[in-house]
UniProtKB/Swiss-Prot annotation:
Organism: Komagataella phaffii (strain GS115 / ATCC 20864) (Yeast)
Consequence of gene disruption: Results in an almost complete loss of mitochondrial phosphatidylserine decarboxylase activity.
Presence of the UniProt keyword Transmembrane in the record: yes
Modification after translation (UniProt): Is synthesized initially as an inactive proenzyme. Formation of the active enzyme involves a self-maturation process in which the active site pyruvoyl group is generated from an internal serine residue via an autocatalytic post-translational modification. Two non-identical subunits are generated from the proenzyme in this reaction, and the pyruvate is formed at the N-terminus of the alpha chain, which is derived from the carboxyl end of the proenzyme.
Segments on the Mitochondrial matrix face: 28-110
Active site residues of this protein: 236 (charge relay system), 366 (charge relay system), 515 (charge relay system), 515 (schiff-base intermediate with substrate)
Described purpose of this protein according to its UniProt entry: Catalyzes the formation of phosphatidylethanolamine (PtdEtn) from phosphatidylserine (PtdSer). Plays a central role in phospholipid metabolism and in the interorganelle trafficking of phosphatidylserine.
Protein name in the entry: Phosphatidylserine decarboxylase proenzyme 1, mitochondrial
Length: 547
């Protein structure tokens, strides 16, 4: 007989019947009733006909499961992850092989090109270094090289700091929108502690760029000059070091010194190649200078004070002739000459002082006393940072860095003032020197016309040759030679003083952002500094006196 319950599985029917048979059995002691016999099978059938789904095991709960959002997949990623219905095993394997081959070819080409570039860069630098040594006729010296104490300082010394400083200078020259100027300068003042009440121009929007704001002027009443002081501070800043120069060595930090000859230069030069034409002095000024020279007999010259050519020369010197920008006024010459005429007959010695200018300080420097500068030496060098940390760790820092040494004399003898460049401070400006250019790749026109290396052997002068080829080659722009010194005189500023007179508190020049000013001078043994290390100074404040 065919089974009519076609829609029911046989196993379910069997289990149902088996369950009914077991339920129909009456246990011992249970009373028999028709109601129980009818109700129990109906409940069993209703319960057993419900399909039991298999239980899915519950996963362990992760506390961080719902705290992070999963990144949404792009359509391209979804298409790549969705498997294709057509499984082409051979084509997929071929594509993988092709991609790996392309990757290997790219890596091999990249490594080959990079290695070739590194080798060519090294060869070019080697040739360039040899050419510089050949042109400057310098011998390497271990005492005037970078000696970092750690790998971090060594890595710092290899950075292109001069190029970075030039880029920073270009950035500072960008003209800012008017609406952005005042907030930018106020933010800079807040960061570096600039006192905006001292600025001579109260309207900050008139500073077109950051360079003008860095080189800002201040109100004269905010920096009174101590007239009675023997010497005043040339700039705002912090005193790093001061004292007496012993055995020709200046103490940079405790246990670290550098030579005064290396700082100021020690080579004697020939006469200038040319002099700049100026108007003749007034007869009154000429007579006053002649009377002053006859009565006081000024005989101080730079060569007599710091000596002639030394045994170890670390710079090649380029003579630039006379670079006086303008002639001195009669009143200024009279004031300075009267002060210099008071010569002291006491025993003398050399003193030094180092003042560091922070980025928030006033960036111009002034004359610390009445003196005459007769010679300028521009030393082309590096632009390492002159922050106190680097002064304690980098030996010969002030010798390595680019600097301008103003050499001259005052009433006690030799006097010099050295503005030292630093990172992002490549531009040093001297108000009365029209041809001074610092942190430049190429020589200026005045350098090319008047400069020639001084040496013991006779050199061929350009004006002695009339060949057009030589004239054409000499007119080309030359690169500035590293570790060289470009020298100029200020003799035409005054016929009697033979230099540029500078009165106490007179502005000399300035630099951008922050740097260091070094003073080296001769004074009697009774001279005493009124300073302390890490002392904050203001321009015009007393720093020394005679006791």
């Amino acid at each position: 007989m065919p089974n009519r319950s076609f829609g029911v599985f046989p196993s379910v029917i069997y289990e149902t019947r088996l369950g009914l048979s077991h339920q129909m059995r009456r246990p011992i002691g249970q009373p028999l009733s028709k109601l129980s016999q009818v109700s129990q099978p109906n409940q069993i059938l209703q319960r057993n006909y419900q399909y039991k789904f298999p239980r899915i095991p519950r996963p362990k709960r992760n506390v961080l499961y719902y705290t992070f959002k999963r990144p949404q997949l792009s359509s391209a990623t979804i298409l790549r992850t969705v498997p294709s219905k057509i499984r082409n095993f051979s084509s997929r394997a071929k594509s993988k092989v092709k991609s790996s081959g392309r990757r290997r070819k790219f890596m091999s080409r990249w490594l080959a090109l990079s290695s070739i570039s590194v080798v060519l860069y090294g060869v070019v630098n080697k040739i360039k270094h040899k050419g510089i040594q050949r042109n400057s006729s310098l011998e390497p010296d271990e005492n005037h090289s970078v000696k970092p104490n750690s790998w971090t300082l060594y890595a710092y010394s290899t950075l292109p700091l001069k190029a970075i400083s030039r880029v920073w200078g270009q950035f500072n020259s960008f003209e800012l929108p008017i609406w952005l100027r005042s907030p930018s300068y106020k933010f800079y003042a807040y960061v570096f502690g600039v006192n905006l009440d001292e600025v001579a121009e109260p309207d900050l929007s008139k500073f077109r760029n950051l360079g003008e704001f860095f080189y800002r002027t201040i109100k004269p009443e905010t920096r009174p000059i101590d007239i009675d002081a023997e010497m005043v501070s040339p700039c705002d800043g912090k005193v790093l070091k001061f004292g007496i120069i012993e055995n020709g060595e200046i103490e940079q930090v405790k246990g670290m010194t550098y030579s005064i000859n290396a700082l100021l230069g020690q080579q004697k030069l020939a006469a200038p190649v040319h002099r700049i034409n100026y108007q003749l002095d007034d007869d009154d000024v000429v007579r006053r200078h002649e009377e002053f020279a006859r009565l006081n007999g000024i005989s101080y010259t730079i060569d007599d004070i710091i000596g002639g050519r030394g045994e170890n020369i670390h710079h090649s010197y380029m003579n630039q002739g006379d670079q006086s920008l303008r002639k001195s006024s009669a009143s200024q010459v009279y004031e300075v000459s009267n002060d210099i005429a008071k010569k002291s007959s006491f025993d003398k010695q050399l003193y030094f002082a180092v003042i560091y200018l922070a980025p928030g300080d006033y960036h111009r420097f002034h004359s610390p006393s009445n003196w005459v500068t007769t010679l300028r030496r521009h030393f082309v060098g590096e632009l390492f940072s002159v922050a106190p940390f680097f002064q304690k760790t980098l030996q010969n820092l002030f010798i390595l860095n680019e600097r301008v040494a103003l050499l001259g004399y005052w009433k006690h003898g030799f006097f010099s003032m050295i503005p030292v460049g630093a990172t992002n401070v490549g531009s040093i400006k001297i108000n009365f020197d029209k041809d001074l250019v610092t942190n430049s790749i190429y020589e200026s026109d005045s350098y090319a016309q008047t400069s020639f290396p001084s040496s013991d052997t006779s050199s061929c002068r350009e004006e002695d040759e009339s060949t057009p080829l030589i004239k054409r080659s000499s007119s080309r722009t030359k690169k500035v030679i590293k570790n060289s010194c470009y020298e100029a005189t200020y003799a035409n500023a005054s016929k009697i003083l033979r230099g540029q007179p500078l009165s106490k508190g007179q502005e000399i020049g300035g630099f951008k952002l922050g740097s260091t000013v070094v003073l080296v001078f001769e004074a009697p043994k009774t001279f005493h500094f009124t300073l302390a290390e890490n002392m904050k100074l203001k321009m015009g404040q007393r720093i020394g006196e005679l006791r």
